[in-house]
Curated annotation (Swiss-Prot):
Keywords: Angiogenesis, Disulfide bond, Growth factor, Mitogen, Secreted, Signal. The lineage of its organism: Eukaryota, Metazoa, Chordata, Craniata, Vertebrata. InterPro entries: Prokineticin, Prokineticin_domain. Pfam families: Prokineticin. Disulfide bonds join C26-C38, C32-C50, C37-C78, C60-C86, C80-C96. This is Prokineticin-1. PANTHER family: PROKINETICIN, PROKINETICIN-1. It comes from Homo sapiens (Human). GO terms for molecular function: growth factor activity. Its main location: secreted.
Amino acid sequence: MRGATRVSIMLLLVTVSDCAVITGACERDVQCGAGTCCAISLWLRGLRMCTPLGREGEECHPGSHKVPFFRKRKHHTCPCLPNLLCSRFPDGRYRCSMDLKNINF
């Protein structure tokens, strides 16, 4: 009976509260795991979240290429994965692509 009362109170608190728990929130890259960086959220202004490094075809920013970056990032995208390059495409956008200079033909 006590357990049921506790669960009821917890559910009541969850439904009444005006907050959310955000996992993956960060301030700097060193707080994120391998293969991620601390980028600005597109949805919540002022929030930074651990975000995966850019894969081939994903948007990137040419000035954002260091991981870890020891200050606060100013972009919503992470640098590309180590084997990729942030390249400008004909449509004017920057995307992660293969570094053709390092391929042996």
